[in-house]
Regions:
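Short, solvent-exposed loop/turn elements at beta->coil junctions and helix N-caps
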Residues: 81, 132-135, 198-199
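Internal alpha-helical scaffold of NAD(P)-dependent oxidoreductase catalytic cores
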Residues: 45, 68-73, 88-192
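Conserved N-terminal glycine-rich FAD pyrophosphate-binding loop of Rossmann-like flavoproteins
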Residues: 1
Length: 202
């Protein structure tokens, strides 16, 4: 946060995946174009009960991980956070409303996923475990894609979209089009989803 500085002092840090020693939990915070390379490298590092929590944008992330790690425990997830890299080693978080939303791995029903929830809660990180994670991932995808498309079309910021009726109308049109795509694969979003998204953007 702008008025709060947090210094992290990890017990171990590396940029080489093969130096990880049988982790219990792997949080994937990478760009989607690195996903295949990273998951292939993880094959020889993780153990059978390692839980993987991917925080990447996209609706196909879990399937892509399963391709390289077919037997792994994966908690599908998405994250809402307003932050950017201020300078090397420093991330500026501009809002205290960050949230991780995750679901259970349906192929591993006997795993106690609530223990993961406890880890984040104890670290004061907002974490929500939900039953219908596919819906939540689609919500995030539509949110990001719609704003990105509209911002690119008008070469403007989030704020400019929300304060201009023409731009905001375009945003709503893009929202509805992507919502129809979701519906075509049986993902149904709430009727007031657009209004909910505007509140989140504010």
């Amino acid at each position: 946060l702008p008025d709060k500085k947090i210094n992290c002092k990890p017990t171990f840090i590396t940029d080489k995946i093969n130096q990880l020693n049988n982790p219990d939990l792997v949080i994937l915070c990478i760009k989607s174009y690195d996903l295949d390379e990273v998951t292939i490298e993880l094959k020889n590092t993780i153990k059978p009960n390692t839980i993987i929590l991917p925080l990447l944008n996209g609706i196909d992330i879990t399937n892509r991980i399963k391709k390289n790690l077919p037997n792994s425990i994966i908690m599908p997830a998405c994250i809402y956070i307003n932050s950017h890299l201020d300078k090397p080693g420093e991330v500026l978080v501009e809002s205290n409303k960050g949230l991780i939303i995750s679901g259970k791995d349906i192929f591993h029903p006997n795993i106690d996923f609530h223990s993961i929830n406890d880890i984040f809660q104890n670290a004061d990180i907002f974490f929500k475990l939900v039953d219908n994670i596919d819906e939540e991932i689609w919500k995030k995808y539509i949110f990001v894609a719609s704003f990105a498309i509209t911002c690119a079309a008008y070469k403007c910021s989030f704020k400019e979209i929300l304060t201009d009726k023409e731009k905001e109308k375009t945003l709503q049109t893009v929202f509805e089009e992507i919502k129809e795509i979701a519906k075509s694969i049986d993902v149904y979003l709430p009727e007031n989803f657009y209004e909910q998204s505007l509140k989140r953007a504010e």
